A protein has these predicted regions:
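Short, charge-rich amphipathic alpha-helices with coiled-coil/heptad character
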Residues: 1-15
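Intrinsic disorder/low-complexity signature
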Residues: 11, 56-59, 88
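Generic surface-pattern signal
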Residues: 15, 36-40, 44, 61, ...
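Long amphipathic alpha-helical coiled-coil segments
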Residues: 21-24, 28, 65-94
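Short, glycine/alanine-rich amphipathic alpha-helical segment
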Residues: 44-73
Length: 94
């Protein structure tokens, strides 16, 4: 894999990660967030994109198969993202 290929893949992984996080169902544990069912609900309630994504990924439901699968997808994409960033930062690609 060349650095250009890794960079292109990292951009694709970042987009997939954003899409996966946007779709995560969440549990609201504060008064302001109790009405939020999805990431997009948090944004509509005035949360910043960054804080809403972070909050949604740490509070997603994992009781059902679909929700657990969505959480696993996010975790997998984050691992791939971290690997690509590491390889690029340390110039380990040919």
């Amino acid at each position: 894999m060349t650095p250009a290929q890794a960079t292109a893949e990292l951009l694709a992984v970042n987009e997939q990660l954003r899409t996966a996080i946007d779709a995560l169902p969440i549990i609201a544990n504060t008064y302001d967030r109790k009405r939020a069912q999805t990431f997009k609900d948090l944004i509509a309630a005035g949360e910043s994109t960054t804080s809403a994504r972070e909050w949604a990924t740490t509070h997603c439901l994992d009781e059902s198969f679909d929700q657990a699968r969505a959480k696993a997808l996010v975790e997998s994409l984050r691992e791939r993202q971290a690997l690509l960033v590491f390889l690029l930062e340390h110039d380990l690609l040919s």
